[in-house]
């Protein structure tokens, strides 16, 4: 008996009519897409990349400790040696020349230079003569300072934090874009499911009405033409049902793929209600958009980068100089300890420069190109700001209009459904023509679809405004993840 019960359960579960359904709301689909979709994983990876790029930038302004050297530096060969009389002889050499250098350096953002301290040890082994010598720098301090040149460190310090902030805001925008995309796929399936429900109901209703019409024809209450019209309606309903089933299957697959879901259960989507009606202050929307959006940060970054190009062109096309100076102690000897006994002063000063004298206007041309690019960037940013503001105004107005539109289409849906029910009952009582019944059916279907499409437009507009402002107007707070 127990085995029979188990077999019955397995039969009903596997039978198509008893297929398991998974009911999902719009909020659940959005949450799943943000959590497990490929797009969400790409957004997380992009945020990690942005974080480590900024960490790398910060590290450039901190002291750098490094150890470099050559161990071993072994050579065994014949080399030419010029003799006092001008002749050349070839002598065998066999030696090892090893070097270790420990250096601590610090970049100076204000000037673009570098200061450093270092210690160096060198050992030379002459295997042919069985001789070993040591040379070393126990201590040395130095500076490398560009003069009249472009300061990359200074400008990076202005631009890189903006890039980091821009990347963080882009991550939030990416998740909100995922919510918008998921909403699109959600309503694509929901519309398909509603069309399927309409098609199933229309097929069932047309089948019932056709059978009633056959009985009426036998009683002489309707004409043969009316019966044929109802038969055509039944065939059309059957064809629409097949198309609706295919569309629903395709839309379901697309939604599952976007969510990253491998659940084989059929999806049954809930018809979402519109969000609680809330007032949207256009000024607040603009302020939040310019405070939160990555594009707003990008406006400042683009202007700084344009100014950076101008400064680079001016600095690098004129007098360029570089000052290198060191001061330290050095010594040599037969033992390592000899290097540290009574070391001698070690100084080095070098000033290198390049002064363009005749360039045939090349340097001026480069500077003018940079200035023109800066002017173009300013104009582009100004245009982008105007477009940005226009998008906010448009989206705020659209959402406010759609809040009202949803209520009207919902009311029209209820009225059309009631009207169809009355028309159907009147037709059964032979109080309504086939044509009028068909009109009521079409109006019912159109009103239902219009309501679902109005909901789709509303929720897409809702999430679009969130993307544009990165602000939650329901909760009155900034969006953060």
Stretches found by the model and what they are:
Residues 30-34, 86-89, 226-227, 261-324, ...:
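Amphipathic alpha-helical coiled-coil scaffold segments and their short linker/junction regions
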Residues 66, 73-75, 82, 263, ...:
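Acidic, low-complexity, intrinsically disordered peripheral segments
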Residues 158-164, 168-288, 398, 402, ...:
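Periplasmic alpha-helical coiled-coil/stalk elements that build and connect Gram-negative outer-membrane
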Residues 69-141, 269-281, 311, 324-355, ...:
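Small/polar, glycine/serine/threonine/aspartate-rich low-complexity segments that form flexible
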Residues 31-41, 48-63, 99-133, 141-159, ...:
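A glycine-/polar-enriched beta->alpha junction
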Residues 1-26:
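Bacterial Sec-dependent N-terminal signal peptides
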Residues 42-57, 174, 178-199, 215, ...:
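Amphipathic alpha-helical coiled-coil segments
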């Amino acid at each position: 008996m127990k085995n029979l019960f188990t077999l019955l359960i397995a039969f009903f579960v596997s039978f198509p009519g008893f297929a398991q359904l998974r009911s999902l709301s719009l909020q659940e689909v959005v949450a799943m897409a943000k959590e497990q979709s490929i797009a969400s994983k790409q957004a997380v990876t992009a945020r990690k990349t942005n974080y480590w790029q900024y960490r790398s930038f910060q590290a450039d302004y901190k002291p750098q400790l490094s150890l470099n050297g050559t161990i071993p530096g072994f050579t065994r060969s014949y080399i030419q040696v010029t003799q006092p009389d001008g002749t050349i002889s070839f002598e065998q050499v066999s030696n090892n020349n090893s070097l270790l250098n420990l250096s601590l350096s610090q970049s100076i953002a204000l000037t673009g230079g570098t200061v450093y301290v270092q210690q160096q040890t060198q050992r030379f082994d002459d295997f042919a003569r069985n001789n070993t010598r040591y040379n070393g720098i126990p201590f040395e301090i130095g500076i490398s300072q560009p003069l009249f040149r472009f300061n990359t460190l200074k400008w990076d310090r202005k631009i890189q934090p903006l890039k980091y902030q821009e990347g963080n805001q882009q991550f939030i925008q990416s998740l909100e874009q995922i919510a918008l995309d998921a909403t699109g796929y959600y309503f694509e399936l929901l519309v398909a499911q509603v069309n399927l429900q309409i098609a199933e109901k229309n097929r069932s209703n047309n089948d019932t009405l056709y059978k009633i019409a056959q009985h009426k024809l036998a009683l002489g209450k309707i004409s043969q033409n009316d019966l044929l019209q109802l038969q055509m309606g039944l065939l059309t309903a059957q064809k629409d049902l097949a198309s609706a089933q295919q569309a629903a299957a395709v839309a379901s697959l697309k939604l599952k793929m976007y969510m990253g879901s491998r659940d084989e259960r059929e999806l049954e989507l809930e018809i979402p209600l519109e969000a609680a009606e809330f007032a949207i202050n256009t000024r607040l929307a603009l302020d939040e958009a310019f405070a939160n959006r990555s594009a707003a940060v990008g406006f400042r970054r683009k202007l700084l980068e344009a100014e950076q190009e101008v400064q680079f062109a001016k600095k690098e096309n004129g007098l360029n100089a570089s000052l290198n100076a060191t001061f330290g102690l050095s010594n040599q000897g037969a033992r390592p300890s000899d290097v540290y006994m009574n070391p001698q002063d070690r100084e080095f000063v070098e000033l290198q420069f390049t002064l363009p004298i005749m360039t045939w206007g090349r340097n001026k041309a480069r500077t003018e190109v940079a200035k023109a690019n800066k002017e173009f960037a300013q104009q582009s940013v100004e245009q982008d700001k105007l477009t940005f503001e226009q998008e906010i105004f448009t989206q705020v107005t659209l959402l406010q209009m759609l809040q009202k539109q949803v209520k009207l289409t919902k009311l029209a849906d209820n009225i059309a459904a009631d009207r169809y029910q009355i028309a159907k009952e009147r037709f059964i009582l032979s109080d309504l023509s086939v044509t009028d019944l068909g009109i009521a059916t079409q109006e019912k279907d159109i009103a239902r679809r219009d309501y679902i499409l109005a909901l789709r437009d509303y929720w897409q507009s809702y999430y679009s405004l969130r993307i544009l402002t990165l602000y939650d107007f329901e909760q009155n707070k900034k969006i953060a993840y």
